[in-house]
Swiss-Prot record:
One of its GO terms (molecular function) is ATP binding. Pfam families: KdpC. Belongs to the KdpC family. InterPro entries: KdpC. It is a single-pass membrane protein. This is Potassium-transporting ATPase KdpC subunit. The gene is kdpC. It is found in: Cell inner membrane. It comes from Myxococcus xanthus (strain DK1622).
């Protein structure tokens, strides 16, 4: 009986060392060696070297001179500590009213936009933290951004096209644009927008107020 206990104890200790110590250390070491940026959170820095967010977590931009992400049901909006969808079903009256309100707001804020409002701009993602838009949803907002920054529409569209990411491995997912990286590209190309007073006009620059 005692030998059986020792065998079980040795098995338990060896298993804990392998799975609780050696395996995590090996995975962490390989990640830091091969993918240091991704392993540390895919941090994004501005032109002055300041961390302004993560490429994996969306931020809620609202100023006219920046591209806006999808609506978010994560807390008060893009709250990294409260990731969630709206949990509203397709027959929900509340979902219909929310989408209608978003549609009205988008049309009011984008009077020069061509074509119908892209569906993703009136619907939340499952996580509430989606950092991407489709190229079509970004281009739809380009006229507003160009007008707010006082530059030609074609120049803003050039920035959008330069930030389009293709399908992963060429086959997975759809082409997409990272909203934070796109807005940083705008600031590099045309200069940052002047700071807004707290609570007025949304974020003054990418990363301001990021969770």
């Amino acid at each position: 009986m005692f030998s059986t206990f020792l065998t079980a104890l040795r098995t338990c200790v060896v298993t804990m060392v392998l799975t609780g110590l050696l395996y995590p250390l090996a995975v962490t070491g390989l990640a830091q060696l091969l993918f240091p940026g991704e392993a540390n959170g895919s941090w994004v820095k501005d032109g002055r070297g300041r961390v302004v967010g993560s490429a994996l977590i969306g931020q809620g931009f609202t100023r006219a001179g920046y591209f806006h992400p999808r609506p978010s049901a994560a807390g008060a909006g893009y709250d990294g500590a409260a990731s969630s969808g709206s949990n509203l079903g397709p027959t929900s009256l509340k979902l219909k009213e929310r989408a209608a309100a978003e549609l009205e707001r988008l049309r009011r804020e984008n009077p020069d936009a061509a074509g119908p409002v892209p569906a993703e701009l009136v619907t939340t993602s499952a996580s509430g933290l989606d950092p991407h838009l489709s190229p079509e949803a970004a281009r739809w907002q380009a006229a507003r951004v160009a007008r707010a920054r006082g530059v030609a529409l074609e120049r803003v569209l050039d920035v959008v096209d330069a930030r389009v990411e293709g399908r992963t491995f060429g086959v997975l997912g759809e082409p997409r644009v990272n909203v934070l990286l796109l807005n940083l590209a705008l600031d590099r190309r045309f200069g940052p927008l002047p700071d807004a007073a707290p609570g007025v006009g949304g974020r003054a620059s990418p990363g301001q107020g990021a969770p």
